[in-house]
Amino acid sequence: MIKLKILLLCFALVGLISCKSSQLKHLLTPETGMFKVEILYPNEEGETFDMEYYEKTHMPLMAGLLGKNLKFYEIDKGIGGRTPNDVVPFVAIGYFYCYDVTEYNKVVGQNIVIILNDLKKFTNIQPVIQISEIKQLKNNDLK
């Protein structure tokens, strides 16, 4: 009887974990019609970038400013170029997935001094920014 209870408890725990995992996956999935703001930090000689500060301080600061308009954000660390011998073109790329681009621009405009002052704390790179509308999401069904 105890073995049966333990087995049922294990099944319940696995079910709970898979539900939470599925919910988290949905939270981190962009949607068609959303906007992706890409902040690219070019890799140039003499430039500095503090990835730890970027991850632990700057991006959470930005997420707080963007509020509910931000669905989620991503951080990429550049590790290579097109070929193994190519220098990495960007040391980092940050992505904000937002529902409303007008609201994004409004928040950034209202907080530009805070954002620029924080930028100086982790890099001397002038970022390149691109805002895109997500037009299509498609899984690769090829196996």
Roles of regions detected by a PLM:
Residues M1-L27:
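Bacterial Sec-dependent N-terminal signal peptides
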Residues C19-K143:
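Macromolecular interaction modules
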